[in-house]
Amino acid sequence: MKKSIFFIMTVLIVVTLVFSISYCEKVVELTFWHHEAPAHRVAAFQEVIDLFEAEHPNIKVTQEVVMWGDAWIKTIAAIEAGSGPDFQFSIPDLLLTSYLLDALLPVTDIVEELDKEYDFIDSMIAPYFHEEEYWGVPIMTMVFLLTYRPSLLEKYVGTSEPPKNWEEYLEYAKKLTDPKNNVYGIGIGGGINLMISEQAYTFMTNTGAKFFDEEGNVIFNNPKTIQAMEMYRDLFQYNPPGAEAWSWGEIELNIMAGKIAMAPYFPSVQRRFDMELDSDDYAAVAHPFPAGGKPGSITYPNEIHIYKWTAERPGHLEATYDFIRFIMRPDINYLMTAVQEPGGFYPVTVAAQEAPEFWADPIISRYEEMNRAAIEALADASLYGFEYGRWVNLGIGDITGANILAEVVNRIVAGGMTIEDAVEWGHNEMEKYSVPVGNK
């Protein structure tokens, strides 16, 4: 009898050990890169990861922050080494770099699945479509509005209502400029950096100007671009001194300080107005446009792309798909948008935009009118080089990386060139990098 009991116990122990080993072998450990370094953004990512792991105990996920300044270098190095993260949060320019190095898996199946379930905004998936495949899954997006301080408009213009067209835009900027009291009408940059490209392109959307035509030919040098640059130049005189060197941080600090009354910018200072100033004196509307122009703005969809080596790691591709499905659930996606950075990131699906969790966020609800304006503006927003629902020029990553649009602006506002000469220069520079896809 004792021998029988001993034998049974031995068998049970062996079975338990085998089961435990088998369980451990089934745990998939995913690693991904993203570029959102502020502590509250990292915390939002971790909250999502913790919730995911609670529902998927056999999948462990690790986030790694790679600063934007290092993103291209580290991505290229990982591709050359043939090993890196399972997936990466990115923007179209960086995705295109990985695509051109033949490092990506198409994600058409998961994009179509999510589109059917949650309904992607068309302009959010357009930057990722090429040769009948999607190469990135949009997760969240960013959009420019005309941000402003209502109290300053009331004081200097006599109304808290923002300008409705470019004529009023210039009138407001002039009236709002009071150097003796350290108040200026506008906050736009003049340096050679990405923010200036973002601001300048927003004006281009209002005139209908583009980098390329539908076949990918460079068409930058045209009257619509010149009209946009003229408006930028005319507004620039109402900047604070030193705006030539500004980037994102200076816009945010100066609109908080009440030094600038208006700025075409992401409505992303909500968290600071709420938590640091406890102020409602911050608003935003769709960017004004000229007579004969149209509504428009820049949007930056942020996506996930997946590397080929992920499919070679047992279980990793399936686990990555599970993670993507999880974060696209509207009851989870609000953590990636409203919680990560209210006003900085917005949902890319109709379902997530309508989710009660998003609108119940205390900061989103405090600045609800501004956030509804952002959601509405996405319908008319686009990204330079990606306006046609597919890739038309594979040189767009190099063109934006070279800050050609920003340098056009710099040459204009610094007085180094006439608008016509600067636009012609920019057109010729774009031609050097241009790789038209053609009408495929």
What are these regions (language model features)?
Residues 26-37, 59-64, 86-87, 135, ...:
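Short, well-ordered beta-strand elements
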Residues 47, 51-121, 127-129, 154-157, ...:
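Extracytoplasmic "Venus flytrap"/periplasmic binding protein-like
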Residues 92-145, 154, 170-172, 196-202, ...:
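Hinge/lid segment of periplasmic solute-binding proteins
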Residues 97, 269-279, 292-403:
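C-terminal lobe and pocket-closing loops
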Residues 108-120, 162, 190, 207-228, ...:
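Short, solvent-exposed loop/beta-turn-alpha elements that line the ligand-binding surface or hinge
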Residues 130-139, 144, 167-218, 230, ...:
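Extracytoplasmic/periplasmic solute-binding protein
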Residues 172-175, 214-245, 287:
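Glycine-centered hinge/linker elements that transmit conformational signals in sensory
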